[in-house]
C-alpha cells in the first residue's frame, strides 16, 4: 500500500538529520555476539515511547496493534510516520507470502514499511509474471541449484546469450544467414547489453520453512536464477527447530542480500545504507532478548 510522495520526501529529509551512526564497521557487526548492535540506525526513541504506551489504533482499519498495522502496512497512531526512516534500495523487491503465514509474525512487513516504493507483497497464489524477464530477476532461496551473489552477473549474461540464440533459431532462415546474424547479435551483446546488464528485481518467499515448498515449486517460479545466502546466520527469535541457522527470516534475508550485493556486485564500500531495514527488527530483537534475560513471561506480547 503506497504512501504519498511528499511524505516520502519529508520522512527522508527529517530522518537524515536524526541519523545516528553507532558503528561503521559492518564486518565487526557480523562477527560480534550481537550482530545487530553496530548498525547505523535512525533514532528508535519513537518505538521506545510506543512500547511504553502500549498498543495503538491503526488509522486505516481501526485495529489495535503494536508499532504498525500488519494488514494495512502503516505505522499506528502513536508512531508518527515522519519519525520512521525511509530506505532507498538499489533493486525492486517482490515478496510472495504464504496464505497461512501469520501476518503479525511476519517480518516481510518491515520491508514494505521502510522501503514502500521498492517493495511489493503478494499473497500466494498471486504471483507476478517473470518468464519474459528471467534475465533480470533472481529468486533468493537455498537449494542445490542456487548460486552465490558474486556469480549473479555471469549467470544473467548467460541467460541473455541463450535468449539471443533462441531468437535466431529460425528454421526458415538459411543457415549461413542465421550464423551471421547470431555473430552480429553476440558482437552487439558484448559491446552494449552485457556492459549494461544488471539485476533489477529480487524475489523472496515469506513463509515458515515447512510451508515454502508449495510456493517454491510453483511453475511460475521455475527456471528463475536461484541465489543463496550461505554465510549469514539468523538471530530471529522464532527460529524453527531442525533448521540450520543459515535459514534467515525474511527481513534478514533482504538486508544481508543487499549488503552483499552492494559490495560484491556494485563494488562499493558499505556504509550502512540499508541498516534501517532492521529498524523494527533490531528493536524487537532487543526487547525480547531483555525480556528473556529477566524471565518476563509477557515476552510474546511485546510484538503482535
From Swiss-Prot:
Motif mapping: DXTW: 206-209
GO biological process: tRNA modification
EC number assigned by the record: 2.5.1.25
GO molecular function: tRNA-uridine aminocarboxypropyltransferase activity
Residues where N-acetylserine is found: 2
UniProt GO cellular component terms: nucleus
Subcellular location: Nucleus
Pfam families (alphabetical): DTW
Chief localisation class: nucleus
Catalysed reactions, as listed in the record: a uridine in tRNA + S-adenosyl-L-methionine = a 3-[(3S)-3-amino-3-carboxypropyl]uridine in tRNA + S-methyl-5'-thioadenosine + H(+)
Keywords: Acetylation, Nucleus, S-adenosyl-L-methionine, Transferase, tRNA processing
UniProt record similarity statement: Belongs to the TDD superfamily. DTWD1 family.
Protein's job: Catalyzes the formation of 3-(3-amino-3-carboxypropyl)uridine (acp3U) at position 20 in the D-loop of several cytoplasmic tRNAs (acp3U(20)).
PANTHER family: NATURAL KILLER CELL-SPECIFIC ANTIGEN KLIP1, TRNA-URIDINE AMINOCARBOXYPROPYLTRANSFERASE 1
Protein name stated in the entry: tRNA-uridine aminocarboxypropyltransferase 1
Organism encoding this protein: Homo sapiens
Gene it is expressed from: DTWD1
